[in-house]
C-alpha cells in the first residue's frame, strides 16, 4: 500500500515535468493509432488535467478529430476550466491570443466551442464576448451559434435583441424556432402570445412543426391567457401533425374557458369529453373545481369535489392545496387546517404552495401562535424555495426572529442563496428594527458581486423609507445610480416616494424627469407619487407640466390623484380653461367618498 502511494506521487511528478507537446501533441497521435477516442477516455484525461490553456487546447484538438463529438460531461467539465482562465486572462481576446501562441489554430470551431461552454455554464457576459469576437476574426456565426446567442438574449430579457438574431439567421433549423417558442411560452404574458403566433406561423411555413412538449406549452399559454379560440387552433395543428389529444389537453381547454369567464362552455366541453369516451382524471376535476372557485361558484365547486370523492379518486397535493386555499377564502379556517393535517395520512408531501396557503389561513384567522407550530414539523428539512417562502411569511406577519432563524438554517445548509433570499433577509432585518445591520449586510452582499436584480435594491431602499430613514434610503439609491446597479421603474418610484416624504420635492421632481433620460419611463404609480407631493406643496406649474405629460402619454390616473389635481388647478381660471375637457370628464367620476389620503403612503415594495 505504501509502495502504491509513493508510485502515485512519483507518477504525478513525472507527468508534471512532461512538456505540453509530449502530453497533448505526441500522446494523442500514439493513442489514436491504437484505438479511436472515446467519451470516457477523453473525459478522464480532461478531469485529471489542470485547468489551463493546455487542457483547453486538448479539448479543441479532440473536437476536430473525425467522427468525434464531445459529450455533455466534457462540456460541463470545461465550464470550470474556462472560468479559471477568464479570471486569469480577464478577456476572451487574451485567451485567444495565448492559444495562438501555444500553437492552436484559430478557426470558427474554436469560437463555437468556447461559445457553447460559456452558454452551458450560464456565463452569458463571456458568451456575448465570444460571439462578438467572431467578427473581428472575419468569421460569420453559423445557425448553431446564433441559436445559442438568441437563447442568451432571451434569458437576459433582451427580447428585441433575441428577435433581431432570429431574423438574422439565414438558414433556420428546428431549434431556432423551438428556442423562440419556449421562451415566449415561459414568459407567459398575453403579449407573448403574439410572439408565439408569429414564430409558429414562420415555423410551419418553413416546414417544421413543434414537438409534443412545445405544443403543450403553447396550449397552456393560450388557456392561461383565456384565448380559447386560439387554443382550439393549436389542437387542430396537433392533430394534423400526428399528435393525439390526451385527457390533459381537454383539461387545459376546460381551464381556458373558465379563465375567459365562460363556465357554461367549460361544463359543456367536460360533458362532451365524457360523451366521446375520454374519461376525466383528477387533473380535469381539479380544473373544474378551481374554475368554479375563482368565479365564486362555490356550490358547484363542492359538487365536483363530492364527485371526486364518490369515484374514489385520491386527492393529490395540487387538489389539497386548492382546498386549503378555498377554505381560507371562505373563512373556514378550521377545515383548511384539517386538510393540511391530513396530508401525512395521505402520504402527501407539502410543497411551497401548501405552506403559503396554510400560513395565509393562520394569519387571516389571527392564529399567529400556531404559525411556529405548523412550521415546526418541517424542521430543517426544506429546500431553497420553501425556505424563502417561510422566511417571507414570517417577515410579513412580524415574526422577524423566526424569519432570520430560517435564513440562518438556509445559510448553514449551504444553499445557493439567491437574490430573493437576500431581499427577504434584509427586509426582515429592517422590519425587526435593525436597519444598521441591514445596511451593513447590504454592502457585504454587493461587495461579493452576487447576481442582484433591481428588486433587491428597491426592497432595501423601500424598507428604510418605511422606517423613516429617508436620507439613508436616498443615499443608497444615489449610490446605485453611481455604481450603475440594475434599477427599474419601481426603484425610481420608491426613491421619489422617499424624497416626497422627506419634503425634498424639488429633488423628487428632478428625479422624475431624469429617469426618462435613462430610458426608464414613469408608470401610473410613479405619476401618482410625484403628483401627490407636488399638490401638497401647491407646485401648480409642475403639476400642469406633469398633467400635460400624462395626457400626451395616455396615462390614466387613479380617482384620488385626479381629485387632488382638480382641487389644485380648478381654482385657477387659465388652468381650468386649458384642461376643461379633461376636468369635465373627471367630475363625472368623482364621488363623495373619494379618499384624498396621501397617495405616496400606499406605495410599498413587497418582497413576496
Swiss-Prot record:
Organism of provenance: Arabidopsis thaliana
Matching PANTHER family: MITOCHONDRIAL GROUP I INTRON SPLICING FACTOR CCM1, PENTACOTRIPEPTIDE-REPEAT REGION OF PRORP DOMAIN-CONTAINING PROTEIN
UniProt PPR repeat ranges: 107-141, 142-172, 173-210, 211-245, 246-280, 281-315, 316-350, 351-381, 383-417, 418-452, 453-487, 488-522, 523-557
Pfam families, sorted: PPR (PF01535), PPR_2 (PF13041)
Signal peptide location: none
UniProt keyword terms in alphabetical order: Repeat
Keyword Protease applies: no
InterPro entries: Pentatricopeptide_rpt (IPR002885), PPR_P_subfamily (IPR050872), TPR-like_helical_dom_sf (IPR011990)
SUPFAM superfamilies recorded: TPR-like
Name of the protein in its database record: Putative pentatricopeptide repeat-containing protein At1g16830
Similarity section: Belongs to the PPR family. P subfamily.
Cysteines joined through disulfide linkages: none
Keyword match tRNA processing: no
